[in-house]
Amino acid sequence: MIDFKSIIGKVATGATLTRDEATAAFDAMMSGEATPSQMGALLMGLRVRGETVDEIAGAVSAMRAKMLTVTAPPDAVDVVGTGGDGSGSVNVSTCAAFIVAGCGAPVAKHGNRALSSRSGAADVLAALGVKIDITPDQVGRCIAEAGIGFMFAPTHHPAMKNVGPTRVELATRTIFNMLGPLSNPAGVKRQMVGVFSRQWVQPLAQVLKNLGSEAVWVVHGSDGLDEITISGPTFVAALKDGEITTFEITPEDAGLPRAPAESLKGGDAEANAAALKGVLQGKPSPYRDVALLNAGATLIVAGRAGDLKEAVALGAQSIDSGAAAARLAKLIAVSNTAE
């Protein structure tokens, strides 16, 4: 058993933890072996100093070791945002997930209810009629039969109940805001991850590389969006063939028009569900464009397209042929017929 006090003492001096120390510390927290004050001290110490790649990788390893896993094809992909960007935008990655699935790439989407916005992935999917509180085996069946499955974080990460109250009391962003998107229960090795701050774009790509991911885009919009934005440039760190490159992309790179960030403002779960349905029905809008851009990046990560223009054209075909909407209909049907 780890000496948690010595870990806090180390962080208090400004020293960094090794990956193994971080794994042990977060294992203790999620096992209920650390007291609330010890957890709060460590989380705030890391936040104030700034978490390192090794510390995040160690924490993710601890979280992955405790999660309830889902069986998915080896080429499955996730498209997910950290949330916490304060934008109150429509559900971009959720909409993108159906577009990607409509292109034939298996999607193992991981998400939760809203933390800071009015509608998280789980909220909007539930409003659409998807059953979200299903077992890991049932999620696997959704991926196999519908080409897409949704893994509701609390179901797959039961050990998080031990840190939940401390997180609520701290009421500020901690390392845990980054761990969820990096701890996909289907063990996907291809990820499109949006983050709430530019400072984390390159480090999180490095974390995923260190943890064995094969193809990754980590993105942050210049307007603060934890997705690829259509209001301006987006900062990207891409992992491909073991190498990480950083670059910027714009909507024009994909042949899409710009639109102000305000055009992506969302509402509650019902309003966002209606907007998502509108996109899948083929209605032109800035929401369609931003969903296509994020789906396009995910298709590149999935190995289905070589560049953004090609990827966005594939995504548009997925919508306009009805394939994306068919994936949603199938997910609703399969998730509600639990065996």
Swiss-Prot record:
Gene Ontology terms for molecular function: anthranilate phosphoribosyltransferase activity; magnesium ion binding
Residues annotated to bind anthranilate 1: 81, 112
Gene3D superfamilies: Nucleoside phosphorylase/phosphoribosyltransferase catalytic domain, Transferase, Pyrimidine Nucleoside Phosphorylase, Chain C
Enzyme Commission number(s): 2.4.2.18
Metal-binding recorded as keyword: yes
Keyword set includes Translocase: no
One Gene Ontology CC term in the entry: cytosol
Pathway(s) the chain acts in: Amino-acid biosynthesis; L-tryptophan biosynthesis; L-tryptophan from chorismate: step 2/5
Binding positions for 5-phospho-alpha-D-ribose 1-diphosphate per the UniProt entry: 81, 84-85, 89, 91-94, 109-117, 121
Record: residues binding Mg(2+) 1: 93, 227
Free-text cofactor note: Binds 2 magnesium ions per monomer.
Record keywords, A-Z: Amino-acid biosynthesis, Aromatic amino acid biosynthesis, Glycosyltransferase, Magnesium, Metal-binding, Transferase, Tryptophan biosynthesis
Pfam family membership, one: Glycos_trans_3N
Family: Belongs to the anthranilate phosphoribosyltransferase family.
Subunit structure: Homodimer.
Name of the protein in its database record: Anthranilate phosphoribosyltransferase
Organism whose genome encodes this protein: Rhodopseudomonas palustris (strain BisA53)
